[in-house]
Swiss-Prot record:
This is UPF0262 protein Rleg2_0240. The lineage of its organism: Bacteria, Pseudomonadati, Pseudomonadota, Alphaproteobacteria, Hyphomicrobiales. Belongs to the UPF0262 family. HAMAP family: UPF0262. It comes from the Bacteria. It comes from Rhizobium leguminosarum bv. trifolii (strain WSM2304).
Amino acid sequence: MAAGDFRLCDVVLDDTIGRSTPDVEHERAVAIFDLIEENSFAPIGHAGGPYRLNISLVDSKLVFAIRTEEGIDVATHILSLTPFRRIVKDYFMICESYYEAIRSATPSRIEAIDMGRRGIHNEGSQTLKDRLTGKIEVDFDTARRLFTLVCVLYWRG
C-alpha cells in the first residue's frame, strides 16, 4: 500500500440483482473502465489505497464497501436512496428519449436531449458527491462515474 495513493483499483457491482438491458450493461462496463482508469477516491481518515469498492443495494439503501487492494476492510458507508429517487427517475426517462431519438430524430433534437441528459446526470453526480462529504472525498468526474453505477444498480434493482 502506497501512502497517499487515493484511487480505486477495482469496482464491483452487486451481482445478486441480475443483469439488465444491453444498453444499461454497456453503460456499466464503460463507467467501471473509465472509473478505474482515472479517479480520485479518498476515504476520510485512511492513510491511502489503492482501494477496492463494492457497490450494492441493501434494504433500499446504497452501500459502499471499501477495502484496500489487499482486501483489508477500510469502511462501509450506507446512504439513503431517497435523495436520488427523483433524479434517477428523470435520468431514466430522458435516457429512454435519447435512445429513441438516436434512431430517428434530427441531430439538433438529439443534441438537445443529450444536453438535458447530461444536466440531470450532473445533478445526480453533485448529489452523490455531497452525500459522500465527510465519508469519502471524490472529485466531480469520479462522482459522475459512480453516479452512473448507482443508476445501473437502481435500474437492475
